[in-house]
Amino acid sequence: MGQGITVAVGRAAANPDRKVYAMVSDGECAEGSVWESLRYIQVSGMKNIEVHVNANGWACYDPIDVDYLERRCKAFLPDIKFHRTVTNQFPFLKDLDAHYYKMTLEDYQTGLECVDNER
């Protein structure tokens, strides 16, 4: 965890003419390499990278204070894209139980219906 953004920063630095996109999760933000990367992007003035945070409010072990995380991310990189994702939209996935739940075919169909209804 936390290595995708470092690779993305390296790619953006190696080829300033290419747009690079990076996605990190809120749980991944516990890694120091994420914060070092965000700081480097800001301090170096790197313009060819776009960082997105998928914030569902959970790490693998505990809930995350998403409001605090968003403020902290914006302090490190004001242009960061912060996406709050809904974790209770699927009735069979609840909080940390979702990590260990084995989906059935019916669950997949329900999930597809939930996603289709959002379009």
Where is each model-derived feature located?
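Glycine-rich ThDP/TPP pyrophosphate-binding loop and its adjacent helix/strand module
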Residues: 2-119
